[in-house]
Amino acid sequence: MTAPSQVLKIRRPDDWHLHLRDGDMLKTVVPYTSEIYGRAIVMPNLAPPVTTVEAAVAYRQRILDAVPAGHDFTPLMTCYLTDSLDPNELERGFNEAVFTAAKLYPANATTNSSHGVTSIDAIMPVLERMEKIGMPLLVHGEVTHADIDIFDREARFIESVMEPLRQRLTALKVVFEHITTKDAADYVRDGNERLAATITPQHLMFNRNHMLVGGVRPHLYCLPILKRNIHQQALRELVASGFNRVFLGTDSAPHARHRKESSCGCAGCFNAPTALGSYATVFEEMNALQHFEAFCSVNGPQFYGLPVNDTFIELVREEQQVAESIALTDDTLVPFLAGETVRWSVKQ
């Protein structure tokens, strides 16, 4: 990586956690990812969810159809785990290079997760098959019991689900997605080479005070929810350390403005347009730009056993204002950091 004062040149990054939705929303948001990233792990929580090879192939084609000419982008598809999923279907998709990984949503943990897994025991045959064939498990790590406080759900998941699972299936490769707590940062750092994590830009840049003090900011509301500043700091320190089993996963999750700005708003930040510059800002603030390229472009492929991208992009350090909104067919999207001045952006 070369780092003159105003330009950062890095190997083309990948996004290891992305929501593209479907229909008009898909067509609107895909270019914001495909112009920057070489690959992205695409989440399967559509309605209905992507649970078959056939559905994944069809969804992949809809994504590719939305990629503008001149963009070189490969969507990496995932299978949505359910209590009734056939292990043979999962293995077939993996062997045919349709499924790159499988996604575990605890039932009702987040958007379109009502079909999710009710207990680990219910999907043990599937997980055992994944361990056998070397297929990564991507985990939304929150318990969803009604009596557990929303700010405690990730920490409780580690002790009650994640650790027992990894003790039982010791060879299973696991990505602890969008970690938000010191508990998770410590757990991943102390884990072995079969455990990795992704972190979003919002969880590195903000804590729950930013979302709640002086008025509720619905465009910072995502799941897992922003935590207190000691957790934010632990995440920042983890990425700044150069730890190689943590990598870029934006969890970019678009919702139309009226679904975010409502009396019962949806969870998710549409950060695809601004995420890479946001990460660069954090690494610069932490005096860790020497680790930025690995976080964006090397650590993920290394964990997944994939080659790194062979092209490069440049970020430029000059102030730019983020658009207030992005047109959607009959509504608008509000991007992460809308209307704000940002320090780093991708050089066009």
From Swiss-Prot:
GO terms under biological process: 'de novo' pyrimidine nucleobase biosynthetic process; 'de novo' UMP biosynthetic process
Modification N6-carboxylysine occurs at: K103
Pfam families (alphabetical): Amidohydro_1 (PF01979)
Record-linked PROSITE patterns: DIHYDROOROTASE_1 (PS00482), DIHYDROOROTASE_2 (PS00483)
Keywords: Hydrolase, Metal-binding, Pyrimidine biosynthesis, Zinc
Binding-site residues for Zn(2+) 1, renumbered to this chain: H17, H19, K103, D251
InterPro entries for the chain: Amidohydro-rel (IPR006680), DHOdimr (IPR004721), Dihydroorotase_CS (IPR002195), Metal_Hydrolase (IPR032466)
Binding site for Zn(2+) 2: K103, H140, H178
Positions in coiled-coil regions: none
Residues of the signal peptide: none
GO MF, one example: dihydroorotase activity
The keyword Kinase belongs to this UniProt entry's keyword annotation: no
Active site: residue positions: D251
The keyword Oxidoreductase is annotated on this UniProt entry: no
Annotated pathway: Pyrimidine metabolism; UMP biosynthesis via de novo pathway; (S)-dihydroorotate from bicarbonate: step 3/3
GO cellular component: cytosol
Catalysed transformations (reactions): (S)-dihydroorotate + H2O = N-carbamoyl-L-aspartate + H(+)
Chain positions recorded as substrate binding sites: H19, L20, R21, N45, H140, L223, H255, A267
Cofactor-binding details, from the entry: Binds 2 Zn(2+) ions per subunit.
Annotated EC: 3.5.2.3
HAMAP family tied to this protein: PyrC_classII
Family affiliation: Belongs to the metallo-dependent hydrolases superfamily. DHOase family. Class II DHOase subfamily.
Subunit annotation: Homodimer.
Function comment: Catalyzes the reversible cyclization of carbamoyl aspartate to dihydroorotate.
Protein name: Dihydroorotase
Organism: Shigella flexneri
